[in-house]
Swiss-Prot record:
The active site is at C75, C223. This is Diaminopimelate epimerase. Pathway: Amino-acid biosynthesis; L-lysine biosynthesis via DAP pathway; DL-2,6-diaminopimelate from LL-2,6-diaminopimelate: step 1/1. NCBIfam families: DapF (TIGR00652). The keyword Amino-acid biosynthesis applies. Its EC number is 5.1.1.7. GO terms for molecular function: diaminopimelate epimerase activity. It catalyses: (2S,6S)-2,6-diaminopimelate = meso-2,6-diaminopimelate. It comes from Phocaeicola vulgatus (strain ATCC 8482 / DSM 1447 / JCM 5826 / CCUG 4940 / NBRC 14291 / NCTC 11154) (Bacteroides vulgatus). One of its GO terms (cellular component) is cytosol. Keywords: Amino-acid biosynthesis, Cytoplasm, Isomerase, Lysine biosynthesis.
């Protein structure tokens, strides 16, 4: 007998996920659900699945499954959406929320008005600057290395924001064939657990134009951890200051790499697309 699951589709700067409150709707096989529901033609259509649950360490917990069923350590856009979800659903009246993720406890500050969450600031923690072989184990020092792929050579800066990223600065982002080079860099032998890939152009106003190929999901409209990694890489490569706007296909995020505490703070919107029920 099929089980009916309630869900909410939400998006943060165009990065859309299917959200299930497991406090009220337990989900037995999230890997299968992520693969089935993320498909646009035969499912709900999304970049993946997010489970909102209880936590012994924080106010709530978050688990993220990419469209291919693989589990992600962290998602900045999803964390903002969870802040909006739990507040507007009446699961909390707090405007500062702690969220347990596989990459640690994140602190969310909700910017509200008339009972609605307008924007969310997430303390993304301290970036871990690693070489490719260590980026998944979160040790080592920052490394910029030339990566051969798709008949070209790319100079990448490696940053871990709870998940691995390689940030590549280019003169003209429109010339990047992301569908071709994205999967080759994601699965490059340098990255034992695969990686997220960001191509970045510095715009005349010093903002950062970014396009992303996400590990396990492919091209997406935006990536919160990717925006943070991009801002950090821009500082390390002397291309931007510690406060910057990252402009993606789905919208803009403000990123602040705080010099005092070393933490990265991401601020941006979160929105509900629709709600529904689906059989599992």
């Amino acid at each position: 007998m099929a089980t009916t699951i309630k869900f909410t589709k939400m998006q943060g700067t165009g990065n859309d996920y299917i959200y299930v409150n497991t406090l009220s709707s337990p989900l037995q096989d999230p890997i299968k659900a992520a693969r089935k529901w993320s498909t646009y033609h035969t499912g709900i259509g999304a970049d993946g699945l997010v489970l909102i649950g209880a936590s012994e360490k924080a106010d709530f917990s978050m688990r993220i499954f990419n469209a291919d069923g693989s589990e992600a350590m962290m998602c900045g856009n999803a964390s903002r959406c969870i802040g909006k979800y739990v507040y507007e659903k009446g699961l909390t009246d707090k405007e500062v929320i702690t969220l347990e993720t596989l990459s640690g406890i994140k602190i969310l500050k909700l910017h509200t008005g008339n009972g609605v969450v307008k924007d969310v600031t997430v303390d993304m923690g301290t970036p871990l600057l690693s070489n490719p072989g260590q980026i998944a184990t979160k040790t080592g020092g920052m490394l910029a290395e030339t990566i051969p792929a798709d008949g070209k050579e790319y100079k990448g800066t490696f940053v871990c924001m709870g998940n691995p990223h390689v940030v590549i600065f280019v003169d003209d982002i429109k010339e990047v064939d992301l569908p071709a080079v994205g999967p080759k860099l994601e699965n490059h032998p340098l990255f034992p657990e695969r990686t997220n890939v960001e191509f970045v152009e510095i715009l005349p106003d010093q903002s950062l134009r970014m396009r992303v190929w996400e590990r396990g999901s492919g091209i997406t409209m935006a990536c919160g951890t990717g925006a943070c990694a991009t801002a950090v890489a821009a500082v390390l490569n002397h291309k931007a200051g510690r406060k910057s706007w990252v402009r993606m296909d789905g919208g803009d995020l403000h990123i602040h790499w705080n010099e005092k505490d070393g933490h990265v703070y991401m601020t941006g919107p979160a929105g509900k697309v629709f709600e529904g029920e689906i059989e599992m």
